[in-house]
Amino acid sequence: MWGTSNCACAKFQIRRRYARPYRRRHIRRYRRRRRHFRRRRFTTNRVYTLRLTRQFQFKIQKQTTSVGNLIFNADYITFALDDFLQAVPNPHALNFEDYRIKLAKMEMRPTGGHYTVQSNGFGHTAVIQDSRITKFKTTADQTQDPLAPFDGAKKWFVSRGFKRLLRPKPQITIEDLTTANQSAALWLNSARTGWIPLQGGPNSAGTKVRHYGIAFSFPQPEQTITYVTKLTLYVQFRQFAPNNPST
């Protein structure tokens, strides 16, 4: 009859007409204009981050006191901004009001490569953030690893060295400073930040404030092992302060 058809084309048109349409994502006809918002530019309390590094040699002496037995020893590293400032020939000038050390990295690798080290022993590294770290400069032989029981201790092999990151903590007493009459006050602004002044403060001892610290233990090897040690500090400075005018 007229108006009816059993062909495939007619069935497809009827099904397409009454079927639920697919939901499509709206396509913008015109390109949207970019809106430029004015960024806030702070003129005070700007924070500048600098990376400071230094390298030195460290040796683990061979065992001579108890040959044939396994003995351990330990050492530690603390951080001070003054250790990273070069005095000669070009002394560094820090024209900032305050600073704080946000992150530190210690890396120690054997100078001859790990293939040349004939020792397979391992020790541990641990972050110690109080004055107790000074106890780990051992001189007497230890029959057990003194850092293995510490929370957060990590194993390192004497033939490969290690690399470890930590957040140093400023010391709050004056016993660890090079001079006893220098103050190590923190000038805490809040519970989370501790800015140490550079320009003022008692005796201007800001750069000499010690920061704790990482301790590392090692088995005493049968031969002396020489390492190259690299320390890296990520230091934040604020409030750029140029030189004072002459009076």
UniProtKB/Swiss-Prot annotation:
Cited InterPro entries: Circovirus_capsid, Circovirus_capsid_sf
Domain of life of the organism encoding this protein: Viruses
Subunit composition and interactions: Homomultimer. Assembles in the nucleus, presumably in an immature form, then migrates to the cytoplasm once assembled as mature virion. Interacts with Rep; this interaction relocates Rep into the nucleus.
Alphabetical UniProt keywords: Capsid protein, DNA-binding, Host nucleus, Host-virus interaction, T=1 icosahedral capsid protein, Viral attachment to host cell, Viral penetration into host cytoplasm, Viral penetration into host nucleus, Virion, Virus endocytosis by host, Virus entry into host cell
Organism per entry: Beak and feather disease virus
Chief location of this protein within or outside the cell: host cell
Purpose of the protein: Self-assembles to form the virion icosahedral capsid with a T=1 symmetry. This very small capsid (17 - 22 nm in diameter) allows the virus to be very stable in the environment and resistant to some disinfectants, including detergents. Essential for the initial attachment to heparan sulfate moieties and chondroitin sulfate B of the host cell surface proteoglycans. After attachment, the virus is endocytosed and traffics to the nucleus. The capsid protein binds and transports the viral genome and Rep across the nuclear envelope.
Region named DNA-binding: 1-40
Protein name listed in UniProt: Capsid protein
UniProt entry tagged with the keyword Cell division: no
Subcellular location: Host nucleus; Virion
